[in-house]
Amino acid sequence: MSMHINNVITHLLYKNESEELQLGLRSEPIDSKSPNGEALVVALHRFYGDKPKGFAEFNYQSDFQEQLEKFRLKEINFYEFSSWTVTRLKDELSKYPFADTGVLALVEYSHLATEYLIIALLPIENSIRLDDGLDINITDHVEFSKITIAARINITDFETKANDKYITYIKGRVGRAVSDFFLDCLSACVTLNTKQQNTVLLQAVEDFCSDSKLERDEKESCKKRIFEYCRDQKKNGEDVQLQELSHELPRNNEGHTFFDYTQEQGYELQESFPVDTATVRKLTKYVGAGGGINISFDSILLGERIFYDVETDTLTLKGIPPNLRYQLQSRR
């Protein structure tokens, strides 16, 4: 992995006998060239890339931004910056009911010519280990799959003012509360709602195809191409580029591209935004669940093998999948 680690440090967040959050500061940063330090950063980078995220930017007169800029200008060192940051995190976290304990990690690193700063609370769990004598020992380990409090700053984009999406944060298990917590800590505000952007995209594609009076097969083909484009962008770790995506669709009856159409009709779409897989999947599938029923089928099947009666609110399926037929027949 083409990664260079500049600084890495961990501090401990724990509760005392009175269940009050306490902070144990490490005396110095971890050696960034050590195998353990490198393993931690690589694991954290990979974990973070797979999680759904929100986007934000610093507020005007952000305290955290001021400290970050002091560090980047070498007015304070990394240890001083990390100590100030985790103290602020502890104070803010104490206000919330999800005040977890664990290891607070700060990592400054570069990957593919981009500089990042990750701040994360790493949950610690017990596990059983057998030694050479087969004696049982209890050991602590970081449970990456349970990280819900983490944020990453794209320092390169922030310093070059490339966009307003340079802060990302994990959308955690208690939803908005975790988002509020990190935004408060970083003195930041939300700049982009990924799911909303993807939902607007789907509506724009639907309207564009309808206004272009495309035949049903043409319409389904267009939606499939858009889905495949979004899927490939997600797979490659890239955002949707609206002008690029526009090339996947034919011009409408007036000779305008899809991008032109979105501008003319006033769809509030950014020129680039991350892919929300669950949302764009609806381009080629109908998906729904509730009341013990979970249904998913390709949209092209509607009207061919699957029929919907609006008046009776009934779905009729012709040609049951063999594995489902076997289960139904075997349980009669």
Swiss-Prot record:
Coiled coil regions in record:
none
Please report a single Pfam family linked to this protein: NA37
Per the UniProt entry, what species is this protein from, by scientific name? Vibrio vulnificus (strain YJ016)
In alphabetical order, the GO MF annotations are: double-stranded DNA binding; single-stranded RNA binding
Q: Output the Gene Ontology cellular-component terms.
A: bacterial nucleoid; cytoplasm
Its keywords, alphabetically, are:
Cytoplasm
Q: Which HAMAP family match?
A: NdpA (MF_00730)
**Keyword Isomerase listed:** no
Q: Where in the cell is it found?
A: Cytoplasm, Nucleoid
Q: Which residues cross the membrane?
A: none
Q: What does the similarity note say?
A: Belongs to the YejK family.
Which InterPro entries does the record cross-reference, listed alphabetically?
A: Nucleoid_associated_NdpA
Q: What is this protein called?
A: Nucleoid-associated protein VVA0877
Name the principal localization, coarsely classed: cytoplasm
Q: Does the keyword Cytoplasm apply?
A: yes
